[in-house]
Amino acid sequence: MAGKRFWILLSAAGLLLLDQLSKQWWLQNLPPGVSQSWIPGLLNLRLVWNDGAAFSLFRSGSQWLGWISLLVSVGLLIWIGRRGRQWSRWQAAAAAFLLAGSVGNGIDRWRYGAVIDGLELVPFSFPVFNLADVAINLAVLCLLIEAIRQR
């Protein structure tokens, strides 16, 4: 049934919209580099630009990372089109999360030459991140759950 593919794409579009709206809000309302408490003791908002990959790896590699994001996104769309009907819920969720995350950060790389990050965990020393990063990590979690479930 094409219904599962539709829901994967709709979910990815919704997550992508949340990612892009949050980044635009950060750009309009946060001074660069200044932490502002959002959820006291847990989460701050801090606008930073990441021209590398996850956790600022491969700094200044935004152009080729933009191409990688584009290739991952196109590959996922083809994969969803061909196999999406056969996937479990966990696999479908992983595809939606991964598509939203790769497109979300890819848009930033193509528009700005860097990814906009704005979420900072307070209790831990952890790089600033965004909703697209969260989506990519949730995709990995969904795939791990599916792998355990199939054992």
Swiss-Prot record:
Short name of any one Pfam family annotated for the protein: Peptidase_A8
EC number of the protein: 3.4.23.36
GO cellular component: plasma membrane
Subcellular locations according to the entry: Cell inner membrane
GO BP annotation list: proteolysis
A Gene Ontology molecular function term of the record: aspartic-type endopeptidase activity
Broadest EC class assigned to this enzyme: hydrolase
UniProt KW keywords: Aspartyl protease, Cell inner membrane, Cell membrane, Hydrolase, Membrane, Protease, Transmembrane, Transmembrane helix
Active-site residues, as the UniProt record annotates them: D117, D133
Protein's pathway: Protein modification; lipoprotein biosynthesis (signal peptide cleavage)
Catalysis performed (reactions): Release of signal peptides from bacterial membrane prolipoproteins. Hydrolyzes -Xaa-Yaa-Zaa-|-(S,diacylglyceryl)Cys-, in which Xaa is hydrophobic (preferably Leu), and Yaa (Ala or Ser) and Zaa (Gly or Ala) have small, neutral side chains
Keyword presence, Membrane: yes
Disulphide-bridged cysteine pairs: none
Membrane topology according to the record: Multi-pass membrane protein
Origin: domain of life: Bacteria
Transmembrane segments: 61-81, 88-107, 128-148
Function: This protein specifically catalyzes the removal of signal peptides from prolipoproteins.
Family of the protein in this entry: Belongs to the peptidase A8 family.
Descriptive protein name: Lipoprotein signal peptidase
Source organism phylogeny: Bacteria, Bacillati, Cyanobacteriota, Cyanophyceae, Synechococcales
Name of the gene this protein is made from: lspA
